[in-house]
C-alpha cells in the first residue's frame, strides 16, 4: 500500500497491496523502480508463485469457512432443543466469521487475481471498510461471549434477571461498535496513482503526516487485538479463580458430609448411596462452555498474533526494511489470521455433540445414509433375535433334555433379578 508524507511524496509500499491494515512502509529501490520512480523502466511486477499460493489458500479458506459456519447456523436453526444464550452467541459469532469470509477473504482473493484493484473509488473505500468490519466483529463477539460466561460463573444470580435481553443488547453493541470503529477506513484508503509512467491506479492508503502510518496501525492493533485480549484475559482470570474456589469449597464440604454420613450409616448397619446434586450438574455444563470459549479465544490469539506483531514491527522499528524477499512473511501471517474463521465451527461441534449430529442430519444425503444404516442395523438385530429364539424354543429344548443322560432333577432354575 502507499504512504504519502506530503503532496510531493512518492508512493511507498510493499510490492503488492495487501489486506486491511498493511500500510507498506519502507520501499526498497527495486520496488520504487517497479513503480516507475527509479532510473529503470517502469514495470508492474510481483512474486507470481507467492500470489498463486495466496490465491489457493484464500480459496480453500473461503470455502471451508462458508461451509463450516453455514452448517453451524443450519444446525442451530433445525435443532429441536431450546435455544440457550450460548447458542445465541455461537450463532452471531458464526455470522461474524461469515462476514470475514465474504467481506475480507473473498475481496482479497479477487484482488490478488487481478493484481490491481478493479473498481471505482467508492468501492475501494467500501471494501476496505468491510474488511476491517469483519475483524472487529469477530473480536468483539468473542469479548461479549466471554463476558457472558464471566457473569454466568462469577455472578450466577444476575443470569436470572432478563438474561436473554442482556445478551441481545451485548450482541447488538458488538455489531454497532464494530461498524463505527471501522469507519476510518473511508478516510485512509482511496484510488490513487501508483505508477508515474503507466498511470496505474490502485486502492492504497494515504497519510498526510509521516507518523500517520504508525498511528493507524497502532490504533487498529489496539482496537482489534490488544484491547480484546486484555479484556478476555481479565475475564478468564476471574473465571478460573471462581471455579478454583468453588471446587475447593465443594471438596471440603463433600468430605465433611461424607464422614458424618459414613458414621451414621455404620451405626445403623447400612450404607447410604451418594445423591447427585443439581448444582454440580449445572457447574459441569458451565465449565464445558467455559472450556469451549477458552479454546476459541486461544485459536483467535494464535492465528492473529503473528500478523499484528509483524505490522507493529514494520512501522515502529526504524531499522526494519521489508524487502521483496521478506514479503512472504507478511503474506503468511495474513493467511494464518484468515484461517481463524475456519476453526471456530469445528470447535463448536467438538464441544457440542448434539450440534454435530444436527448438522449432519441437515443434509439430505446424510439423512438417507443414516436411514439406510439404521435399516440394516434393525434387520441384523431382527435376524439375531429370531436365531436366538429358535434355539431357545420349547420344541427344540424338550428333545434335547429327553436325550440327555443327566437327570432332569440336576437342573436347577436360578432366578435372575430384573
Swiss-Prot record:
Regions of this protein lying in the Extracellular compartment: 1-52, 111-125, 191-218, 314-331
Lipidation (S-palmitoyl cysteine): 365-366
Membrane disposition: Multi-pass membrane protein
Intrachain S-S bonds: 124-203
The keyword Lipoprotein appears for this protein: yes
Signal sequence coordinates: none
Biological process annotations from GO: blood circulation; calcium-mediated signaling; cellular response to hormone stimulus; cellular response to water deprivation; G protein-coupled receptor signaling pathway; generation of precursor metabolites and energy; grooming behavior; maternal aggressive behavior
GO cellular component, one term: endosome
Biased composition regions of type Polar residues, renumbered to the chain: 383-399
Pfam family membership, one: 7tm_1
Modification Phosphoserine, positions: 404
Main location group: membrane
InterPro entries assigned: GPCR_Rhodpsn, GPCR_Rhodpsn_7TM, V1R_C, Vasoprsn_rcpt, Vprs_V1A_rcpt
Keywords assigned by UniProt, alphabetized: Cell membrane, Disulfide bond, G-protein coupled receptor, Glycoprotein, Lipoprotein, Membrane, Palmitate, Phosphoprotein, Receptor, Transducer, Transmembrane, Transmembrane helix
Topology feature Cytoplasmic, residues: 77-88, 148-168, 240-293, 352-418
Recorded coiled-coil stretches: none
Sites where a glycan is attached: 27, 196
Family the entry assigns: Belongs to the G-protein coupled receptor 1 family. Vasopressin/oxytocin receptor subfamily.
Task performed by this protein: Receptor for arginine vasopressin. The activity of this receptor is mediated by G proteins which activate a phosphatidyl-inositol-calcium second messenger system. Has been involved in social behaviors, including affiliation and attachment.
Protein name, entry field: Vasopressin V1a receptor
Gene expressing this chain: AVPR1A
Amino acid at each position: 500500500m502507499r504512504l504519502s508524507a506530503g503532496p510531493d511524496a512518492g508512493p511507498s509500499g510493499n510490492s503488492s497491496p495487501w489486506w486491511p491494515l498493511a500500510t507498506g512502509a519502507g520501499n526498497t529501490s527495486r520496488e520504487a523502480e517497479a513503480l516507475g520512480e527509479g532510473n529503470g523502466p517502469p514495470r508492474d511486477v510481483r512474486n507470481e508463485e507467492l500470489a498463486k499460493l495466496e490465491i489457493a489458500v484464500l480459496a480453500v479458506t473461503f470455502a471451508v469457512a462458508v461451509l463450516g459456519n453455514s452448517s453451524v447456523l443450519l444446525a442451530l436453526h433445525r435443532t429441536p432443543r431450546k435455544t440457550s444464550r450460548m447458542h445465541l452467541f455461537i450463532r452471531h459469532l458464526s455470522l461474524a466469521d461469515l462476514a470475514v469470509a465474504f467481506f475480507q477473504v473473498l475481496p482479497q482473493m479477487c484482488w490478488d487475481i487481478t493484481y490491481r484493484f478493479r473498481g471505482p473509488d467508492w468501492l475501494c473505500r467500501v471494501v476496505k471498510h468491510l474488511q476491517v468490519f469483519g475483524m472487529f466483529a469477530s473480536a468483539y463477539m468473542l469479548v461479549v461471549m466471554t463476558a457472558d460466561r464471566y457473569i454466568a460463573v462469577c455472578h450466577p444470580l444476575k443470569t436470572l434477571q432478563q438474561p436473554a435481553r442482556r445478551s441481545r443488547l451485548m450482541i447488538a453493541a458488538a455489531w454497532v461498535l464494530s461498524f463505527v470503529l471501522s469507519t476510518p477506513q473511508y478516510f485512509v484508503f482511496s484510488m490513487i496513482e501508483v505508477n508515474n509512467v503507466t498511470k496505474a491506479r490502485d486502492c492504497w492508503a494515504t497519510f498526510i503526516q509521516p507518523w500517520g502510518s504508525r498511528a493507524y496501525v497502532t490504533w487498529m492493533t489496539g482496537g482489534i487485538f490488544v484491547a480484546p485480549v486484555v479484556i478476555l484475559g481479565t475475564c478468564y482470570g476471574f473465571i478460573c479463580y471462581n471455579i478454583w474456589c468453588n471446587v475447593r469449597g465443594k471438596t471440603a464440604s463433600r468430605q465433611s458430609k461424607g464422614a458424618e454420613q459414613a458414621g451414621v450409616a455404620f451405626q445403623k448397619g447400612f450404607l447410604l448411596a451418594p445423591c447427585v446434586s443439581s448444582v454440580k450438574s449445572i457447574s459441569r455444563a458451565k465449565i464445558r462452555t467455559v472450556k469451549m470459549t477458552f479454546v476459541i479465544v486461544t485459536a483467535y490469539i494464535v492465528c492473529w498474533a503473528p500478523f499484528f506483531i509483524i505490522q507493529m514491527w514494520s512501522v515502529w522499528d526504524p531499522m526494519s526494511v521489508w524487502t521483496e524477499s521478506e514479503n512472504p512473511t507478511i503474506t503468511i501471517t495474513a493467511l494464518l489470521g484468515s484461517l481463524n474463521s475456519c476453526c471456530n465451527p469445528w470447535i463448536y461441534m467438538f464441544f457440542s455433540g448434539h450440534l454435530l449430529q444436527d448438522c449432519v442430519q441437515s443434509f439430505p444425503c446424510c439423512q438417507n445414509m443414516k436411514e439406510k444404516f439404521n435399516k440394516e442395523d434393525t434387520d441384523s438385530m431382527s435376524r439375531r433375535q429370531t436365531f436366538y429364539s429358535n434355539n431357545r424354543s420349547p420344541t427344540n429344548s424338550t428333545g434335547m433334555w429327553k436325550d440327555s443322560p443327566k437327570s432332569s432333577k440336576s437342573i436347577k432354575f436360578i432366578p435372575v433379578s430384573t
